[in-house]
A protein has these predicted regions:
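Anion-binding alpha/beta catalytic cores of soluble intermediary-metabolism enzymes, centered on
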Residues: 2-266, 271-333
């Protein structure tokens, strides 16, 4: 990933404007390795959540130098009472008591999210041992959606070397969050995914995917993607959008010449909007496993601050890359 267009720019921007990122699983070996690398680069400061003694013991056990980073233990955090008070205010509609808030905030995922909410950190990366829901739920409850966003969605960035020597970079969404997004949500997701892709050097050309190409098939699912594409075109006239398209018509110039010769997107799409989470999750994993793409994500979109989720099967390199991506997004929210 280091030679991906856009990634070097992220690192350079972070060197000029360093950020602080929370890792909610401070004793995990992969997190410690990534934190050590980030500290060596001097452009990102990690906060490791956990018992200080346990974190230091784990770092020594695995052989990683985390000097220069910060360890914050929920059990002895000096601003914990302030955190409880703010949590109660944020969740007052649910009638949360201080006792309930304190208990919840002893959980690293909620504690770490509140560090971002309070401005102690700029971003958060979790999920090495948590489920996606355990990372996203605190973000929805505490960070909430940014102005103009009606939903939180996700994007995967897929990268592989090409014959030209430059990496091929694609964006896909929503592959992780919304089970069955509405037409309006799909239109918004298209914009968010396209904007995310720009950070990685993508000049977005957006395809709304279906089993039909511009009316070749019929059914509610086809209508949904066609209508979503039409709404997105109306809302974002500067963004090249086509839909509905079958995947071959979206990426193959030969197929596009036959099926939709007048489209400015068909045959050259690089940003793909799936009808639901089933298609999206299957699609990016096929690209990853059979197409030899490296997949980075899910990158959460639409929040007031960068909160991102790791796969529980991630390795340290993926943690390192996602930390840089997450922190860099703090410059653009």
């Amino acid at each position: 990933m280091d030679n991906m267009k856009g990634f070097g720019m992220m690192i350079q921007e972070l060197k000029k404007n360093p950020k602080t990122i929370v890792f909610t699983e401070g004793t995990d070996e992969r997190i410690l390795e990534a934190a050590s690398r980030l500290l060596a680069g001097s452009f990102l400061t990690p906060i490791l959540v956990g018992n200080k003694e346990a974190v230091l013991e784990a770092a020594e056990k695995y052989g990683y130098n985390i000097r220069g980073g910060e360890i914050i233990d929920p059990d002895d955090y000096e601003r914990f009472d302030e955190m409880v008070e703010l949590f109660c205010e944020l969740r007052k509609s649910k009638g949360v008591t201080p006792e309930q808030a304190a208990k919840t905030l002893k959980r690293n995922n909620y504690f770490g999210t509140m560090l971002v909410k309070m401005g102690v950190a700029d971003a958060l990366l979790g999920g090495a041992t948590y489920s996606t829901a355990d990372t996203v739920r605190p973000a929805l409850q505490l960070i909430k959606t940014k102005p103009g966003s009606s939903c939180v969605s996700s994007c995967f960035i897929l990268v592989r070397p090409s014959a030209t020597g430059e990496n091929e970079v694609l964006a896909m969404g929503d592959c992780a969050i919304n089970l069955k997004p509405s037409e309006d949500q799909l239109a918004e997701i298209a914009w968010e995914v396209a904007e995310c892709g720009k950070h990685f050097g993508i000049d977005p050309k957006v395809a709304f995917l279906s089993y039909s190409t511009l009316g070749s098939g019929k059914g509610e699912d086809v209508d949904k993607m066609r209508n979503a594409a039409a709404k997105a075109k109306e809302l974002y006239p500067s963004l090249p959008i086509e839909g509905e398209l079958q995947f071959d018509a979206a990426v193959s110039p030969r197929v596009a010449r036959t099926k939709c010769p007048n489209s400015e997107v068909a045959g050259q799409a690089n940003t793909f909007i799936f009808p639901d989470i089933n298609a999206g999750n299957i699609g990016y994993k096929i690209a990853q496993r059979l197409g030899n793409f490296d997949a980075y994500g899910p990158i959460l979109l639409g929040l007031n601050a960068p909160i991102n989720d790791l796969s529980r099967g991630c390795n340290a390199e993926e943690v390192y890359s996602m930390a840089i991506i997450t922190a860099a997004l703090a410059n653009n929210i």
